Amino acid sequence: MGNGLWFVGVIILGVAWGQVHDWTEQTDPWFLDGLGMDRMYWRDTNTGRLWLPNTPDPQKPPRGFLAPPDELNLTTASLPLLRWYEERFCFVLVTTAEFPRDPGQLLYIPKTYLLGRPPNASLPAPTTVEPTAQPPPSVAPLKGLLHNPAASVLLRSRAWVTFSAVPDPEALTFPRGDNVATASHPSGPRDTPPPRPPVGARRHPTTELDITHLHNASTTWLATRGLLRSPGRYVYFSPSASTWPVGIWTTGELVLGCDAALVRARYGREFMGLVISMHDSPPVEVMVVPAGQTLDRVGDPADENPPGALPGPPGGPRYRVFVLGSLTRADNGSALDALRRVGGYPEEGTNYAQFLSRAYAEFFSGDAGAEQGPRPPLFWRLTGLLATSGFAFVNAAHANGAVCLSDLLGFLAHSRALAGLAARGAAGCAADSVFFNVSVLDPTARLQLEARLQHLVAEILEREQSLALHALGYQLAFVLDSPSAYDAVAPSAAHLIDALYAEFLGGRVLTTPVVHRALFYASAVLRQPFLAGVPSAVQRERARRSLLIASALCTSDVAAATNADLRTALARADHQKTLFWLPDHFSPCAASLRFDLDESVFILDALAQATRSETPVEVLAQQTHGLASTLTRWAHYNALIRAFVPEASHRCGGQSANVEPRILVPITHNASYVVTHSPLPRGIGYKLTGVDVRRPLFLTYLTATCEGSTRDIESKRLVRTQNQRDLGLVGAVFMRYTPAGEVMSVLLVDTDNTQQQIAAGPTEGAPSVFSSDVPSTALLLFPNGTVIHLLAFDTQPVAAIAPGFLAASALGVVMITAALAGILKVLRTSVPFFWRRE
């Protein structure tokens, strides 16, 4: 080296001597002297301040031997990303006293050059005293980057030249919530700890799981070691560049995304980094670290004062939460409130099930039905609870050293279900663009578990007959989320839905939790193939039939009962001892093609079934409307309609009719009836008579053709057929509507017994799903587009006469009779008198 040249600093020494279990920090001694020097350097005055180190040219030895390895592909574009680490090398950044005019050299030294060298005799002998072993920290901010002006310029330029992620830190500095952890309740006052394995309980390997273990899933324990990802070293980079990189021991990741949003949660030992971004809102980030840890904020490079910590609530007994976002106090208050609530979730419990239960309830919250389209505050709350449930699940599993089989399957199933609800119901995602992945299992163990679950699904479908186990088989296929699993259970799921529909037509009320759960997962596995691409003809036919039967199961009475059941369940759930699991309260209306459940007539029906309560009428009406709107949006997948009912979205002349369908009835493989409040320009149209002119109903038979015509509905008392064995009604749909414009039912005639029942007409005193005591009109829709009016099934209004009116009428008749009798008596007395005068 020349006399005028002296080297002064190393910001990061990326050396890994075997298994290193700690992060070390070194501060350049001249750091404080160089605080103001970073303002002097500009790499590109057109785009702003950007510092980049020089790298040797590999083609120019001898310095070229220290060039970055080719696999890193370090360029001026990739250098700012700080992806400098390579396992076979250690990197050294060398700067001079001329910094920042001289940006320094980034050199790479192969580790083989450093290992096995003889000791340097000029250096003092190493001490023989072994240092006291310290446990590796769970979270370690890499302050080496903070304490070097060169790195500070790089990170600050990225945070402040590109964008300012936290323009108003005071808006994100808020007090702790009411239900977060305290000194007396370090896990939160409402926390219900997850179950722990009993002393001596056996840990079952996943390769030995059988149906008996599924029967006893709540007492079957799996060892965490080998099943979940082992904690590994990882450098977490804040996407907003608002803080410095953080060294963590990662345990997995949760990712949810679609065409309109992306959520990514990185889990670690006592760490979570959650990023939520949407097309309709600025991105937000939540970082959870141990209580004694602090994350420094990246400050303005023009500010001589060092920046403080990231904003967020004060630290708790176990964790400290930091909140990042571009929200200001002038923004929408609901967005700030939602972000504050998300920041409190990690300190409100340790049980994943409580967070999933709260997320399901949040989906049906009052503002869930307030408006259509994306709702960032609701999406933030849903995904915040979803991510926190994963954080709690992983932490509890590692802390206990074991995980319950029912908890493992429950977490995987409910998190997937909630991800779909959040994406479609709150973010406005297209249904066929949603993707979801939870990477908390060891890759090898995951493959073994999936293979075993696939085998158990096949065994359940082959051997078992109970509805509960079949529902569990569909749930396992839903967890596996693979085409082979869906194809394996699809025939059984379709048969189950047909069987439940037959019981419904026979008068059985399908209200038990196991029936709801079976319908939920059976409907899910039949609808799922369209997400993987274009469904096959068999998949489309199964899905169309399941949608038709779900619509048939969703009568007006069922819709009102569903609303009442959800209200009761939500009011009863405390998310501690009583949890709210949506599949146990699933309604076929949510998987149907009925989009009219939020209309006023249905709201009144639901309110009529409400039990006595102290809840004000206005609040009850708002809750009822919110639940109905949520059910309608849940069912209304535009992508699902395009995939399975393409004739309903067929465009003619380059444009589709701007008419919102109220009900779709896929009656054949390529034709559907649609109910609307306005006429459609194509198809065979019928105007339904006897309906309030303010809410008219139009029925249209649609195919892929663009021709349009209108017909009149033919009236018949009963269907007359020539062949008593085959009445020709199988495949038709029985539809009933009221004068108020409410479609009460659309029932599929799918068996000979059902068609015989319709041909015979209603029976006095015999209850039937085809009868009603509400004034209404009955139609029969045929697969060929013909519609007839079944007069025998109509219900005519009966005049209601008050008892007082009847008594007054009877008294009037008696008085009139008495008056007539008196007149006759007078006449009889007077007639002889007239005769005498003559």
Curated annotation (Swiss-Prot):
Compartment annotation: Virion membrane; Host cell membrane; Host endosome membrane
Impact noted for substituting A150T: In strain: Nonneuroinvasive mutant HF10
Lipid bilayer topology: Single-pass type I membrane protein
Region (Interaction with gL): 259-323
GO biological process, one term: fusion of virus membrane with host plasma membrane
Signal peptide boundaries: 1-18
Entry-linked Pfam families: Herpes_glycoH_C, Herpes_glycop_H
Transmembrane segments: 804-824
Residue numbers on the Intravirion membrane side: 825-838
Modifications made to the protein after synthesis: N-glycosylated, O-glycosylated, and sialylated.
This protein's UniProt keywords: Fusion of virus membrane with host cell membrane, Fusion of virus membrane with host membrane, Glycoprotein, Host cell membrane, Host endosome, Host membrane, Membrane, Sialic acid, Signal, Transmembrane, Transmembrane helix, Viral envelope protein, Viral penetration into host cytoplasm, Virion, Virus entry into host cell
Predominant location category: virion
Virion surface compartment spans: 19-803
Complex and partners: Interacts with glycoprotein L (gL); this interaction is necessary for the correct processing and cell surface expression of gH. The heterodimer gH/gL seems to interact with gB trimers during fusion. Associates with the gB-gH/gL-gD complex. Interacts with VP16.
Family designation: Belongs to the herpesviridae glycoprotein H family.
Main function: The heterodimer glycoprotein H-glycoprotein L is required for the fusion of viral and plasma membranes leading to virus entry into the host cell. Following initial binding to host receptor, membrane fusion is mediated by the fusion machinery composed of gB and the heterodimer gH/gL. May also be involved in the fusion between the virion envelope and the outer nuclear membrane during virion morphogenesis.
UniProt name for this protein: Envelope glycoprotein H
Lineage, top ranks: Viruses, Duplodnaviria, Heunggongvirae, Peploviricota, Herviviricetes
